[in-house]
């Protein structure tokens, strides 16, 4: 009976989103800090702080990796021109409307 109660109470918690988003590129994270979205350079950003952002302008910030952009689920406009990343996967950004990723070294865009 205790095991059943435990499962009923904690099983729904497995579906909750992660509280932090992994952002391995220090320049990307620093750009988020400069925008007031993050506070500490530690490779993690609070997901609840980025999941409502609709516009993101991170041009000329020497960013080589945009890992973490997938958790910007409300993002409509992204300007990330003049950086140095080679891949950009925006397949998890369902409402994205406008992207400017010019002057990068893109070999893959999704």
Where are the predicted features?
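N-terminal capping/linker segments that flank leucine-rich repeat
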Residues: 5-79, 88, 94
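Consensus positions within tandem repeat domains that build extended binding/scaffold surfaces
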Residues: 97-103
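Short, intrinsically disordered, charge-balanced linker/junction segments flanking boundaries
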Residues: 107-110
């Amino acid at each position: 009976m205790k095991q059943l109660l435990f499962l009923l109470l904690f099983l729904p918690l497995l579906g909750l989103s992660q509280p932090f988003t992994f952002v391995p590129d220090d320049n990307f994270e620093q750009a988020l800090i400069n925008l007031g979205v993050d506070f500490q350079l530690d490779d993690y950003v609070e997901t609840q702080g980025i999941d409502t952002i609709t516009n993101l302008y991170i041009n000329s910030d020497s960013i080589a990796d945009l890992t973490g952009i997938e958790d910007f689920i409300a993002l409509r406009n992204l300007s990330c021109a003049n950086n140095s990343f080679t891949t950009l996967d925006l397949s998890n950004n369902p409402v994205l409307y406008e992207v400017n990723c010019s002057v990068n070294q893109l070999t893959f865009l999704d």
